[in-house]
Amino acid sequence: MAAGAIPMAYQTTPSSPDWLNKGDNAWQMTSATLVGLQSMPGLVILYGSIVKKKWAINSAFMALYAFAAVWICWVVWAYNMSFGDRLLPFWGKARPALGQSFLVAQSELTATAIRYHNGSAEAPMLKPLYPVATMVYFQCMFASITIIILAGSLLGRMNIKAWMAFVPLWITFSYTVCAFSLWGGGFLFQWGVIDYSGGYVIHLSSGIAGLTAAYWVGPRSASDRERFPPNNILLVLAGAGLLWLGWTGFNGGDPYSANIDSSMAVLNTHICASTSLLVWTILDVFFFGKPSVIGAVQGMITGLVCITPGAGLVQGWAAIVMGILSGSIPWYTMMVLHKKWSFMQRIDDTLGVFHTHAVAGFLGGATTGLFAEPILCSLFLSIPDSKGAFYGGPGGSQFGKQIAGALFVTAWNIVITSIICVIISLILPLRIADQELLIGDDAVHGEEAYAIWAEGELNDMTHHNESTHSGVSVGVTQNV
């Protein structure tokens, strides 16, 4: 190589324009894939194993279907509703994200420019150093996991056809509004509400919407509510492990760059999750006499959720404090308050998504308003002088902004989710028929999760040329 020559890896080519940062692009796609693995197969495995045996397939399929459905919604209209040009203060303009010229151009979040009242620029728009295609992929994984988390509130009784209608409607009218308002440059973003990686957009939204939908769908059968043991706790741990390690990309990818703030976010994520898991387990031992594996998983999740709104914005000691709070407050709301509050008893939130995601997400957003560190904020946020109340001065107002942002997300999800459920109920029953509730997977899908000889022979398609559903032919059979 001649002296002074640019190495091939850094030369500008048609496929590697001068604005492309290959390191950022590689990390962003890796982060997106890690988040995708949280859903596929992470939550598919977790849902399929944490429920009663007769609901294993139905629960896993709800997650599988949602993952695919969100992809189509996202690229056809929802991405630009969340991150495109402003239509309303809380909503972007719907248009496809499918054209080559759009997808290979540099990513620009046009509505994220911060302006003074006179119209002059205070902070430029966000322009990550990779193509739009990478951003579409990354954000699609967040949209997918949000609706899959929501599904956890509805396992064991929702009509699968109603769920198939619910997913695109909720993504369109609820998720896109929260995403644009807080991330895409909407009014909460402009005001300075902090949501680093989805404590509000993803977790508070899914927890509140899940509880609301559970109200409209109604409870599981009496026998299922009384006894609903996991069918495979070891697989629950496998799904939980994918969820935990996948959170490295979940929070580490949100600076939209492979920078020092990303490293801080990843470290804080694991500190908070570990602390929360230990606190939840200690409380289980102290009050119930023995540690619970399911309880430990719940503590892990609440820690991951709690750190998410401020993952790259708080110091390590604050991550420990947040872990202590996330391991104890959601534990109290789930194990004590839920059992004493008659209103919560009437709503059947199958996996306690309200506690593990809504309560923990709100807690994380509020504590971010307290502990957001000024220097770390300057590395990530577009709003100048952002900091938590703990650091004094104008930081006190940040806590109020965080509470106001949570109230908007909560109210929007209650109203929109209710409207969606009512509309669907006019066309399709929201619940599985009572007779099918007694049977489970076999009635809904004609399949069983653990079909062994004699038990599963009814649906063994190597013995029958058609499924138990009349009129549905089987093209290919396979011995496994």
From Swiss-Prot:
Keywords for this protein: Ammonia transport, Membrane, Transmembrane, Transmembrane helix, Transport
Subcellular location: Membrane
Presence of keyword Cytoplasm: no
Keyword match Nucleotide-binding: no
UniProt record, GO biological process: ammonium transmembrane transport
Primary localisation category: membrane
Topology of the protein relative to the lipid bilayer: Multi-pass membrane protein
Transmembrane intervals: 31-51, 59-79, 135-155, 169-189, 198-218, 233-253, 265-287, 292-314, 318-337, 361-381, 407-427
A single GO molecular function term of this UniProt record: ammonium channel activity
GO CC, alphabetical: plasma membrane
Annotated Gene3D superfamilies: Ammonium transporter AmtB like domains (1.10.3430.10)
Record-linked Pfam families: Ammonium_transp
Family of the protein in this entry: Belongs to the ammonia transporter channel (TC 1.A.11.2) family.
Function, in words: Involved in ammonium transport.
Protein name: Ammonium transporter 3 member 3
Organism in which the protein naturally occurs: Oryza sativa subsp. japonica
Gene assigned in the entry: AMT3-3
